[in-house]
């Protein structure tokens, strides 16, 4: 049996701030507007360095499934990774993490939040979803992972918007839209059913979406 957990390691993070090991350091919008990508870069570097520590902690306890935080790069929707002052160091750390994960058979995944919605009738939401999902995939790329469902990026369909068939059609169109999702993002992409009967069941996803997206 394999064990895993999601995002926050309570043992390592529930300690005095100076000793805290966590991957979701962020800042409020006012701070971001004042300090910009320099501060975002510093926090992202601290987050990936701590991600490496968390995986080593996991390995010592035979924990090899880990869902990573979606907040590794603070305010990632507001800049490109390549513009970060520390991106070269961040890349090296992520590559090292990827090698460690492969060598020790760790499976790493992502589950972006509910604001990621390819089925949204609002194009602005869809565009933000493209960037969010592609950003997650780029982290895996920087780790050196071959794109597959083994390093999955898992989301929900979202709402039904009063018509499941039309929503499914819109989802499929947005999934395939040129210039939207990167190829590697599509190869890592998975959908999860909802718990509520009125939302998206496993059968709904299989019947209405799977056959058109794979």
Predicted regions mapped to residue ranges:
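Alpha/beta catalytic barrel-like cores
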Residues: 1-106, 116-119, 124-129, 137, ...
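Conserved, mostly hydrophobic/aromatic
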Residues: 111
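A broadly tuned preference for mixed-charge, low-complexity surface segments
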Residues: 114-124, 159-168
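Eukaryote-skewed repeat-based solenoidal scaffolds used as protein-protein interaction platforms
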Residues: 133-214
């Amino acid at each position: 049996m394999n064990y895993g957990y999601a995002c926050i390691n309570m043992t390592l993070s529930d300690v005095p701030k100076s000793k805290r090991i966590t991957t979701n350091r962020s800042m409020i919008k006012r701070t971001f507007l004042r300090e910009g990508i320099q501060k975002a870069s510093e926090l992202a570097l601290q987050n990936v360095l701590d991600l490496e520590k968390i995986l080593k902690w996991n390995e010592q306890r035979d924990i090899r499934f880990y869902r990573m935080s979606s907040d590794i790069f603070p305010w990632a929707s507001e800049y490109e990774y390549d513009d970060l002052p520390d991106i070269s160091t961040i890349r090296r750390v992520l590559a090292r993490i990827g090698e460690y994960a492969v060598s020790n058979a760790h499976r790493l995944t992502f589950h972006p939040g509910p604001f990621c919605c390819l089925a949204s009738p609002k194009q602005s939401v869809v565009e933000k979803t493209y960037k969010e999902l592609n950003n997650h995939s780029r982290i895996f790329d920087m780790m050196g992972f071959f794109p597959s469902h083994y390093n999955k990026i898992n989301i929900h369909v979202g709402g039904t918007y009063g018509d499941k068939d039309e929503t499914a059609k819109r989802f499929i169109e947005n999934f395939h839209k040129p210039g939207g999702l990167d190829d590697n993002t599509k190869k890592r992409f998975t959908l999860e059913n909802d718990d509520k009967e009125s939302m998206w069941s496993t059968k709904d996803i299989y019947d209405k979406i799977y056959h058109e997206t794979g």
